[in-house]
UniProtKB/Swiss-Prot annotation:
Organism: Homo sapiens (Human)
Biased composition (Low complexity): 646-655
Composition-biased stretches (Polar residues): 1095-1109
Disulfide bonds: none
GO cellular component: azurophil granule lumen; cytosol; extracellular region; membrane; plasma membrane; ruffle membrane; secretory granule lumen
Protein name: Rho GTPase-activating protein 45
Amino acid sequence: MFSRKKRELMKTPSISKKNRAGSPSPQPSGELPRKDGADAVFPGPSLEPPAGSSGVKATGTLKRPTSLSRHASAAGFPLSGAASWTLGRSHRSPLTAASPGELPTEGAGPDVVEDISHLLADVARFAEGLEKLKECVLRDDLLEARRPRAHECLGEALRVMHQIISKYPLLNTVETLTAAGTLIAKVKAFHYESNNDLEKQEFEKALETIAVAFSSTVSEFLMGEVDSSTLLAVPPGDSSQSMESLYGPGSEGTPPSLEDCDAGCLPAEEVDVLLQRCEGGVDAALLYAKNMAKYMKDLISYLEKRTTLEMEFAKGLQKIAHNCRQSVMQEPHMPLLSIYSLALEQDLEFGHSMVQAVGTLQTQTFMQPLTLRRLEHEKRRKEIKEAWHRAQRKLQEAESNLRKAKQGYVQRCEDHDKARFLVAKAEEEQAGSAPGAGSTATKTLDKRRRLEEEAKNKAEEAMATYRTCVADAKTQKQELEDTKVTALRQIQEVIRQSDQTIKSATISYYQMMHMQTAPLPVHFQMLCESSKLYDPGQQYASHVRQLQRDQEPDVHYDFEPHVSANAWSPVMRARKSSFNVSDVARPEAAGSPPEEGGCTEGTPAKDHRAGRGHQVHKSWPLSISDSDSGLDPGPGAGDFKKFERTSSSGTMSSTEELVDPDGGAGASAFEQADLNGMTPELPVAVPSGPFRHEGLSKAARTHRLRKLRTPAKCRECNSYVYFQGAECEECCLACHKKCLETLAIQCGHKKLQGRLQLFGQDFSHAARSAPDGVPFIVKKCVCEIERRALRTKGIYRVNGVKTRVEKLCQAFENGKELVELSQASPHDISNVLKLYLRQLPEPLISFRLYHELVGLAKDSLKAEAEAKAASRGRQDGSESEAVAVALAGRLRELLRDLPPENRASLQYLLRHLRRIVEVEQDNKMTPGNLGIVFGPTLLRPRPTEATVSLSSLVDYPHQARVIETLIVHYGLVFEEEPEETPGGQDESSNQRAEVVVQVPYLEAGEAVVYPLQEAAADGCRESRVVSNDSDSDLEEASELLSSSEASALGHLSFLEQQQSEASLEVASGSHSGSEEQLEATAREDGDGDEDGPAQQLSGFNTNQSNNVLQAPLPPMRLRGGRMTLGSCRERQPEFV
């Protein structure tokens, strides 16, 4: 192959002909062009490196896979630096490097031809070396000498290649070094003993690869077409990336020896042999295996943290690209819009692919396989270590036994020698003794002979034991050696498996990272080149060109004098800061003087006062006349006309002045006050002004809203409002724009007070502000629950939503009595009431009465149990009832010692719980259930250091028993005090008159007795009305009741008012009423027909939507607080 390439090169035109044809000749180093700033020229005297530079020893071996790119950075080598020799593609004659003093002359010099011949001679020597290597490896004879001979031929070929690359650095390319590394690996791994065809094919392929790579590089070098991106130029003096790194350390300028070639990678058998020969080889191998496990753990930790960062970066990039894409793509004609649109898409694709790649790395290719391999590695290492230590312990025991047997054997031999000496001595003494002493000497001799025989036997036994221990020690030693061989082989196998796993995982990781990051430079370069093509102002011109607008019309300015149409306008007389229904006259009377339109029909004269302080608040709007009792108002009642109002602040309010055609005011007017002088629920007008398009809550519609001008604190969410805020012109309430949907504080038409610390405060402080001693929060919650939640299943037992409960508590502290509860959940309201009572520092039933009340409950339970035991199977429950009555009597005596406000609030709350119990079939709340709920709340011991004391846990049933008894026997416990109402009630009204109303369609024998709920006894008498929201109830009521029954109901309502002197409250319109106004109404309509009272009450009994109609009820009989109704239907009477 090399000979054919040589002949082709000889046929190519010479360098001189190229120069004469116009090809550039070698130029001085100072004139060499720079290519993109990456190829620097070093003005050295020669391309050949100094001789001493080749003597620098390189460490390690450099092996590269054959699939690497031609780019130098892909092989792990940096591009040529400032001190490296590089040459661009424009240099056609790279054979010699002209120094500044040796500039080439015209034509082809003789040195050029000599360089070509020298290069071709070196290439021929390299080809011969490869041929010798091929013959040595593939020959079939001399099996023992083939390996060293092959390594010698390989070293000779690499030495020639190293000399060529040292002389011509431009030949040092990635392909050449990669092919050389592959050839070295194949030669070292070749099995010369076995005739394996697969290994021969791989060796021949590696040999052909290096020949093709080197010949191609030489051909490109001679043609001047060497690609600078494939060079591996090494700075002078740095040989760590040169040819020496392919085959390890060597001598200066000499090829490596056979030992140096073999030191790179020893066969597995040789590694085991080396470890077997050295002392502590198994321990060294085990230590390496242990360190390798730690190394894998560190690798996993590093890659896990790195992939986590990659994942976070990819997700963050996706997020910002997705968020910015919407805003960037809004305007169509922006500069470089397509560039950044493409960049955002590339970022999204990169982030998506990176997330997938990281997930693959974590689950499939790197972390999971490496983790499993580490665990298996540690398991096998520990097993091998245990087997090795077990073999060592056996050998140590054998050696110990051997030492003991040797000592015993030596001792027995010494004893035997001593016995033989004594026998010999006795024989000599016997021989030299006198004839008369022969018997004694004979006995002594016999004795010593016996001792000598015993010592001989013991010595023989010790020798046998010694020999056995020696044989056992040899056996254990051999077993240890066998275990050593097995352990070393297993350790190497485990290490090789772990190496293979690490290798495959690493290749997969970096290959995947290369696949992810390789397109990025191309994308960035493409974006850069595309950005260079943009002309400033191009997109702006395109935008202007696409605008399709009409020609701008000519405008003329002329002076127009003002002509006044009227001398008086009702709008000019409007008050500045607040709204009054009389400020705007009817549209027909716009030109009339003030005397004619000052007071309209149906509007009191006091309503025309123009000051805010003189405004009179009414509970019902006056837009519906007294005679209009239908659900649909007449044409004159519903036609309103809006007039714009000029505010002193320059802002629009949320409600506008509404005037009906008859002059009646359609805006909010109020006539009666609540605890603080304001009604808790105000009529709602149609929203308008700056917040008319917002979803306003029922309470928010009562405010006159304008835009917030200064930062303030939101009364709904208790955070500061800086932008997009609203405030009320009358009560100065500030609120976020978004909080208007859930605002629960109504307008009080005067400046709202600061926040009240309500929860957790002393009960006497809250009760001091109430005339009857019942705090407003208790009244609000109880009235709302009685209005619409008496029959709610699980009331007080089911908890509300925590967030809504907290907002309600905050609303009570901010708005006090002005909190709107009609849109709140009944369970939330009941939870607020329980929370208020639970957070009192001292409960309603004082601490000092706790032990007495609990003691009464214990005695009552004990007595009831004894009564049940005494009655045995009898059905009579009089004993239990007597026990309960006795307990109620004693409770009445104890509760007299409570403070007045505590007793009043407790009576108010128990009356409410009594009403809940009366409908327990619907709400499932029995007195026992309510006792369980309110027992620990109303009656608890004095707090101690423990969070929940044991005694309080034990007393829970007794607390529930006390509250259950108070609910069941409410009339007995509080019989001495009449029920009081906020409107006032005389004690003499305890006795009720008996009212009998005949029902025309009921039979005499059918009578049903209903308990009359004492709704007039407290501040929130419940009125039953029929709303448009329940069409079925309205139809049923209209079918059952006639006009005559409604007339009878009118007389009945006024009779009940005279007997109890209690004011009626309208549940749909407001929670409290004014007794004086009802009495005044009764006086005004008392002389009319019998439908007058009912119609007068129904005129005022309207809710915020003016869609409520009174429902006539069946006639009834009142006797002592109970109602007797002659009806065959179980129908509860309803009052209007």
